[in-house]
């Protein structure tokens, strides 16, 4: 896919946070690849952390392992803040609701204050700005699953549906 890393382009303003699921789970890898293709189609200047990205620690915290969570959070915050000091990372985009919640709401306690955007919101913005447009109609019905961390914890319900409504032919 030829995706640059922040190490290659440290002043890049949009970081695509891949997350654990998209790194290891075959179905989630498809989401990550599709997201990269969409970001490129919209001419978004973005990068990933690559091997510098660690788990956000969300699952460790939910399992009660605060030590592991803090270790991972401190490590990630050091990396992210380092790139911010070089003029990069104004926005973090992620498809993972758990990563979204952790980066946006829990890393502040470790000195990490970021503008984090769920990929549905980011894609909707690209659609509305005319930077992305569906190339063909897609016939069929679609159901969107509201994950706990996206919906109930972060009140993101409409943007995924609005983005889907912009695709001709979907019900």
Predicted features along the sequence, with ranges:
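Iron-sulfur cluster-binding electron-transfer modules in prokaryotic oxidoreductases
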Residues: 1-171
